[in-house]
Curated annotation (Swiss-Prot):
It comes from Thiobacillus denitrificans (strain ATCC 25259 / T1). Its EC number is 6.3.4.2. Keywords: ATP-binding, Glutamine amidotransferase, Ligase, Magnesium, Metal-binding, Nucleotide-binding, Pyrimidine biosynthesis. The active site is at residues 378, 516, 518. This is CTP synthase. PROSITE patterns: GATASE_TYPE_1. The gene is pyrG. CTPSs have evolved a hybrid strategy for distinguishing between UTP and CTP. The overlapping regions of the product feedback inhibitory and substrate sites recognize a common feature in both compounds, the triphosphate moiety. To differentiate isosteric substrate and product pyrimidine rings, an additional pocket far from the expected kinase/ligase catalytic site, specifically recognizes the cytosine and ribose portions of the product inhibitor.
Amino acid sequence: MTKYVFVTGGVVSSLGKGIASASLAALLESRGLRVTLLKLDPYINVDPGTMSPFQHGEVFVTDDGAETDLDLGHYERFSSARMSKRNNFTTGQIYKSVIDKERRGDYLGGTVQVIPHITDEIKLSIREGAKGADVALVEIGGTVGDIESLPFLEAIRQMGFEDGPANTCFIHLTLLPYIPTAGELKTKPTQHSVKELREIGIQPDILLCRADREIPLDERRKIALFTNVRPEAVIEVLDADSIYKIPAMLHEQMLDEIVCHKLNILARAADLSVWKRLVDALEHPEHTVNIAFVGKYVDLTESYKSLSEAMIHAGMHTKSRVKIHYVDSEQIEKSGVDCLRGMDAILVPGGFGKRGVEGKIAAIRYARENRVPYLGICLGMQLAVVEFARDVAGMADAQSTEFDPTTNHPVIGLITEWLDRTGQVEKRSEQSDLGGTMRLGGQPCTLKNGTLAREIYGADSIVERHRHRYEVNNTLLSELEAKGLVVAGRAPGTELCEMVELPPAVHPWFVGCQFHPEFTSNPRNGHPLFISFVRAALAHQQKDSA
């Protein structure tokens, strides 16, 4: 029988429930338990796929093509569990499912209500997502007290009652703000947050208290007294300069032991040797590299969360501190590329819409002409093809039809047909809905022998995750290849272009990929593409300093 750990948050949002859940998952996994994680989001969108990055941050894509919350990226990076569409659901999905059932007549003419129909659907989704795990960690998005979260909180309250205290554990994450004028941490917000939770019918078993300084023992005892939580289960979570230090911080306060005891689980001692090695690599780099991220969502770096984490992982595996410089592509359009001088490498990530595109193309041109290592991801690959077509192949008006439908040289166009991960044919048109209609999830790619891509991956065939609706136009690709562009990877069956590069005689490291390799990078193994990219940046740095 699967046991459940429910993680809620109080006082303010963005306290780090996702990191806390992922860190606990890492601890339980190190004790030999099979773990999975679920994220319940209270917004009414069916998924975050059409939400602005400024509103939601990154959209994390799973192997099965689900567009999900960025916390699922943390789950995969901290544990060996692979996420799927069963691991993230929203109020929109729950209500849509219930309404569809009502329209089919599944409720036999009954009045459909929040309780029991919505809460039953939530419980069903949780149990489906938790199948096969010893422990399922379920994170409830939002903050206790939000009206949107109430059906989710009621559902987990019912699960606590149905499954019993030996099979459920409730963790509440709160904030202890420091008031400079008083010179002390304040516990009252935590007390009121727990009071609100208890009014709903949930008594937390463990409190994780965020603070920017050590919480005095007397204050912890006070919190325990007023919240009805055991003193040893009032755990401080101090601000850390790296999220990868959190598992050890929680383990030192015996969080995993407290959870196992609450759930009546006999498990081996935790082995954190891998995490200690990773933190040591993070804290003792031998080099520093400067990499420019040229994008349009740089004011909210959460939009590139998996990318920035993938660069940190690559740094761990190359003994390097990777210093990311976020560059607004619109600023390049206004002021030129001088801001890129001195960079050891340039990366252009994915994105949507015309704003800032010419600035990205200017950055790509700078990287190509100055032999600066370049990695283009998704739109970053497409724009590398556009830049090559314009400045090398002589197609002066080359563009993507996403930005100029009337161009005479549409080197990038809408994908109208492709094979999904199950081999079924998917078709799209300009009139298709925006939500859930992209080429999504894990897709195979065959690499060309003798290419840099083949050398980097060390394999003839790979599977990477995708999220796009535009692709390189095969009808013009032969002209670009004749001018020196190398197609390093193609999708079998459809021959869609998946990777491009420049020959080593022209450029030491210039690679574009249509997929998103950042979604499969983790601190334990890194990702070969990012590791090679950082090594190329180091080589460029050493060449410049010679």
